[in-house]
Amino acid sequence: MLLSSAFVGSCLAILNFAAAVSAQGGLSRTTLNIVNKVISPDGYSRDSVLANGIHPGPLISGNKGDTFQINVNNQLHDNSMNTSTTVHWHGIDQHHTNWADGPAFVTQCPIVPEHSFLYNFTVPDQAGTFWYHSHESVQYCDGLRGPLVVYDPEDPHKDLYDVDDDTTIISLSDWYHSPAHELLPGPIPPNSTLINSLGRPDGSDLPVTIIEVDPTKRYRFRLISMACHPYFDFSIDGHNMTIIEADGSNTEPLSDIDQIRIYPAQRYSFVLEPNQTPGDYWIRAAPLQLGNTSNPDTTTSLGLAILRYTNRSGYAQAASVDPYDISQTPIPVNPLLEQNLHAYGDVPELDEECDDCKLTFDFAFNFTAVDFTVNGTSYVNPTVPVLLQILNGTYTAQELLPHHSVYTLPRNKTIEITMPGAVTGGPHPMHLHGHSFYVIQSMGSDTTNTVNPVLRDTVAVGGATGDNVVIRFRTDNPGPWIMHCHIDFHLALGFAVVLAEAPQDVAEYVSPIPTWDELCPIWDNAPSHN
């Protein structure tokens, strides 16, 4: 493939920029070749969409302050799934680099087959557990997802653990035996749950992931839900966990937790001390389906792995417990409650004189149209990305497309969003791009916390009538940021809005690279769109 002069010039500019910032931070370079490949993580062979031919995709890592340069090469050819692609770096704020955020038709046009795009962004003040995934239709459900970790050499919790590396990342994924678009409007229960790269469908005895621990060390595990649909009850038989991070933000250590309910796109770091009798212990991820908050699936799609002590004398401990026997499944005594997590730092106060700073998003499902709505409107991708519309001089919510799905926000204000419960198909994990937010009121809680609530980027909404979720954040990051349900099938059915933050300031704050300008003309001239 011939490289355009703009592409070459862009690469040289980026390399010069990277050299200029190297004194302040490092440079993390990665190439992701997006390919089709037949894999069988649960014993069933199917074609998939993968980064570098593996699932999950390769770990991308760096340190706080680093610049990340990630070249995405689209080598897809299987028309039974999406062949265009984008990649979103989930949880990264993207200050000054809204163009690199990734959601198709919000911040960019998709990358078509046989073309590449170089994402370039700096992470100056974030550290923690993130991930990356396709943000084109339901493509990430077909396998395009992987871990992204930003380490902090000055981590305030570093005295609590001894090991934190690629062996302590635990990913949870739902896996389907059919291409994701065939499951729409869906979703349907997954055929299996994968812990890292392996799963067992229908209660089989196929191999599972084994995670080894040395009883003389303490481990920081980074738990990532890469799911498209279910949420999970995660636990490790016989072991408690100390939570120290949620969605890339440190929390006050919360100890003695024996179960974590984790929703799609959420992440937690927990410290585990292997202080039990040496042996093997089941790691469990029991999926819960939509509308079912009390009965996890402990049989057909139960996710399993093994925590193995390196000084064990045998394998009897795990083998003697039937993981599918409910009578042998440990009952949680102290499960994690979101409202018990507390962040560091000050919660921003409301701007009482700001009429545009308090929003309510009413979610609903239209059974006739078979779509989701936010305040009565179902989101449909515009033909021109919202960022490009803004850079071309369109600033008002009345003018920006898609109509009635774009909300403009003033700059440097505190925004409070209320999301009532009782939503069909919930709970719904709502993710806001470009920001972390304080969860003033959590799902299922009748109390508010404006002192030290958890700071995160994905929060569950659902519950009963009258059950509100309230979040709060500062508008310090001009650009269009999509807010959507992270059940990917629901996003495909219109469960989203765009928050256009200080649109009149975007041109000064965001400067896309030349190859970004080429994406839409290439997309428009592609012979077909899939």
Curated annotation (Swiss-Prot):
Question: Which reactions does this protein catalyse?
Answer: 4 hydroquinone + O2 = 4 benzosemiquinone + 2 H2O
**Record-linked SUPFAM superfamilies:** Cupredoxins (SSF49503)
List where in the cell it is found: Secreted
- So where does Cu cation 3 get bound? H135, H433, H484
Activity control, per UniProt = Inhibited by chloride ions. Inhibited by citrate. Inhibited by oxalate. Activated by acetate.
Cite the binding residues for Cu cation 2.
H90, H133, H486
Q: Which Pfam families does the UniProt record give?
A: Cu-oxidase, Cu-oxidase_2, Cu-oxidase_3
Q: Which residues form the signal peptide?
A: 1-23
State the PROSITE patterns in the record. Answer: MULTICOPPER_OXIDASE1
Protein family per UniProt: Belongs to the multicopper oxidase family.
Q: What does this protein do?
A: In vitro, has activity towards 2,2'-azino-bis(3-ethylbenzthiazoline-6-sulfonic acid) (ABTS), 2,6-dimethoxy-phenol, and guaiacol. Although brown rot fungi preferentially degrade hemicellulose and cellulose, the enzyme may contribute to generating small amounts of lignin breakdown products required for catalytic reactions.
Database matches in PANTHER family: FI03373P-RELATED (PTHR11709:SF394), MULTI-COPPER OXIDASE (PTHR11709)
Q: What is this protein called?
A: Laccase-2
Q: What is the scientific name of the source organism?
A: Fomitopsis schrenkii
* Gene name for this UniProt entry: LCC2
